[in-house]
């Protein structure tokens, strides 16, 4: 063993130095790697620990691989050398046995002794070869480790640069996130302000709309009252016109009577002049006397004899239109006339709209109880707030020009079926009764004894 150690030291005097150099290079690499790490980062200690553990794991892995491979290679090479040496000795012995005679067998013992010595030398040589191969492998390993350490240093430097850039980018992103959070906070504040403003505006708008609706309802009531007053004024005007017409008739009669009396007086005066004598001579014009007091009216004289019928006077003012007379009896149907020529073919007309209002129970189609068609059924209208304007709308919707009168208390008889409407408020300009202001369809607080009716101009 001492020989082997001396031989190893002799053959490999620099092996210990290489090991020291390799350890120093490892220390230097570790120092350089630790020195190149950033100190000012927040995640510095954990990253350095990770890199140190990574280095230790790599070094242990390489040492384990070298420790396993080197003995295997040495054993294989030793077995190959032994096998070759044995083959060579056997071949030499065979050749010597065949070539030499029996006389030389005494030298075989010497040869065997030499062979054993040679074998021992061969073993020593094998051990030296193994030590050389081991030292060579160590040298190769140290070079590879240095190269690997350099490559790892470069990679680590690149990784550190990338980490620095990542850290700077993360810091920038953090700053941008802080700015974004601040802007979001300001936006939240502005949104809260906007919500408060919108709520206040909504409250104001609701109040203003409520006030406007109240004002509109008041205006509608006023308009309704004014229209009712106007309608009542129109009715009073019609009554006044009728009274004026009657007064005019009375005045015409009085004027006729006065004319007749005037004519009678003129006739009496004519008769008196016939009885008197001839006129005397005209005397001198006397002084004008004082105006006397007006005497009392004289007693009416006796009515004289009616005179001769006078000339026809001027045409007087036309009198008022009298009430319509009773309808006459229908006349006899006349004989049919000759058949006329065939007329031209007319164009296709549009579909006539279905009537939703009708008059029932009157003397004709122009008057009767007002019935309205709704939900597939005919029903009546209650007479609450039923006035001339609603009748005007009904008459116009049926094709008549004006309304003559409106009727309440089932004037044309009580209807059947549902009572659809109540308290209908119309302005008189609507096209149909459905366009008037209607509270609801279907009335339960009214009976058919209050059905409304109307009379239109025929």
Curated annotation (Swiss-Prot):
Q: Tell me what this protein is called.
A: Macrophage scavenger receptor types I and II
Listed InterPro entries: Collagen, SR-AI/II, SRCR, SRCR-like_dom_sf
| Occurrences of domain SRCR (ranges) | 357-457
Q: In which residue ranges is the amino acid composition biased (Gly residues)? A: 316-325
User: Where does the sequence pass through the membrane?
Assistant: 56-78
Residue ranges of region Spacer? 79-114
Region described as Disordered: 272-357
């Amino acid at each position: 063993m001492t020989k082997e150690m001396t031989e190893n030291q002799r053959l490999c005097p620099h092996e210990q130095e290489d090991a020291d150099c390799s350890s120093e290079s490892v220390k230097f690499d570790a120092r350089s790697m630790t020195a190149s790490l950033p100190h000012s980062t927040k995640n510095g200690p954990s990253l350095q620990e990770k890199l140190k553990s990574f280095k230790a794991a790599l070094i242990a892995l390489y040492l384990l691989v070298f420790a396993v491979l080197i003995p295997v290679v040495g054993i294989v090479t030793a077995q190959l050398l032994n096998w070759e040496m044995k083959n060579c000795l056997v071949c030499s012995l065979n050749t010597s046995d065949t070539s030499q005679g029996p006389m030389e067998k005494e030298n075989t013992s010497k040869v065997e002794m030499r062979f054993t010595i040679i074998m021992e030398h061969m073993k020593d040589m094998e051990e030296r070869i193994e030590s050389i191969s081991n030292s060579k492998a160590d040298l190769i390993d140290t070079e590879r480790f240095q190269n690997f350490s350099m490559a790892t240093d470069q990679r680590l430097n690149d990784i550190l640069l990338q980490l620095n850039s990542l850290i700077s980018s993360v810091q920038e992103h953090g700053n941008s996130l802080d700015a974004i959070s601040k802007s979001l906070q300001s936006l939240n504040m502005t949104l809260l302000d906007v919500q408060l403003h919108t709520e206040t505006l909504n409250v104001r708008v609701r109040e203003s709309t409520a006030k406007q609706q109240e004002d509109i309802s008041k205006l509608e009531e006023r308009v309704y009252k004014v229209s009712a007053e106007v309608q009542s004024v129109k009715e009073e005007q019609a009554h006044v016109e009728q009274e004026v017409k009657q007064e005019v008739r009375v005045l015409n009669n009085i004027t006729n009577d006065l004319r007749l009396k005037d004519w009678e007086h003129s006739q009496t005066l004519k008769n008196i002049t016939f009885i008197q004598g001839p006129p005397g001579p005209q005397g001198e014009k006397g002084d004008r006397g004082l105006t006397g007091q007006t005497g009392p009216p004289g007693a009416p004289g006796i009515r004289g004899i009616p005179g001769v019928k006078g000339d026809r006077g001027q045409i007087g003012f036309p009198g008022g239109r009298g009430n319509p007379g009773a309808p006459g009896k229908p006349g006899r149907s006349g004989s049919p006339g000759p058949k006329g020529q065939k007329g031209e073919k007319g164009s296709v007309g549009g579909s006539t709209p279905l009537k939703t209002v009708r008059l029932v129970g009157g003397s004709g189609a122009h008057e009767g109880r007002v019935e309205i068609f709704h939900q597939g059924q005919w029903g009546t209208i209650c007479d609450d707030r039923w006035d001339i304007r609603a009748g005007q709308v009904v008459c116009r919707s049926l094709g008549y020009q004006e309304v003559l009168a409106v009727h309440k208390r089932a004037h044309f008889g009580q209807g059947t079926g549902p009572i659809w409407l109540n308290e209908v408020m119309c302005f008189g300009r609507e096209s149909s009764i459905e366009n008037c202001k209607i509270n609801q369809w279907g009335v339960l607080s009214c009976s058919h004894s209050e059905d409304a009716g109307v009379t239109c101009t025929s």
